[in-house]
Swiss-Prot record:
GO MF assignments: rRNA binding; structural constituent of ribosome
Record-level GO BP terms: cytoplasmic translation
Name of the molecule in the record: Large ribosomal subunit protein uL6B
Species of the source: Saccharomyces cerevisiae (strain ATCC 204508 / S288c) (Baker's yeast)
Protein family (similarity comment): Belongs to the universal ribosomal protein uL6 family.
Misc. remarks from the entry: Present with 76000 molecules/cell in log phase SD medium.
Length: 191
């Protein structure tokens, strides 16, 4: 079944400006700027005023309508990122061999370096994405905090770190060692 026209509305809070030119969305807010290329998705953007944008699909089937809702979610996440920011807390879990995590710089790029995972001599490196800041928690032992404006970059960095510490060829019910996401939240908390 084809839908003649389906549209979603995106509300823009005060202090945030959204500019759209040939399906490249640029969101500027108090925490910074985010840009997303949406040329591959066939949607129409209409700026009603400075507080409202309409996103529409004409003669679309279920897949196009689903893509419309995806575009709305992506832009909403960008608006949240430039106003509140995203923060992921990760904890190291180990039974015997303590995991050692450091931040190193090689050739101008930052890496998260994981040593002594399950007693391995192998050094695991995870590249840090642009716009993601990493710090170690001062009041909680064995915790690392990833924060940034883009939820895609922060969550992908957390997933990369969790995946590189996956236990292979052992019973994962017994070998629970790894680095896991313990909390997902915002940098600027609502009062």
């Amino acid at each position: 079944m084809k839908y003649i026209q389906t549209e979603q509305q995106i509300e823009i809070p005060e202090g945030v400006t959204v500019s759209i030119k040939s399906r490249i969305v640029k969101v500027v807010g108090p925490r910074g700027t985010l840009t997303k290329n949406l040329k591959h998705i066939d949607v129409t953007f209409t700026k009603v005023n400075n507080q409202l944008i309409k996103v529409a699909v004409h003669n679309g089937d279920r897949k196009h309508v689903a893509a419309l809702r995806t575009v709305k979610s992506l832009v909403d996440n960008m608006i949240t990122g430039v106003t509140k920011g995203y923060k992921y807390k990760m904890r190291y879990v180990y039974a015997h061999f303590p995991i050692n995590v450091n931040i190193v710089e090689k050739d101008g790029a930052k890496f998260i370096e994981v040593r002594n995972f399950l007693g391995d001599k192998k050094i695991r490196n995870v590249p840090v994405r642009d716009g993601v800041t990493i710090e170690f928690s001062t009041n909680v032992k064995d915790e690392i905090v990833l924060s940034g404006n883009s939820v895609e970059d922060v969550s992908q960095n957390a997933a990369d770190l969790q995946q590189i510490c996956r236990v292979r060829n052992k019973d994962i019910r017994k070998f629970l060692d790894g680095i896991y996401v313990s909390h997902k939240g915002f940098i600027v908390e609502d009062m």
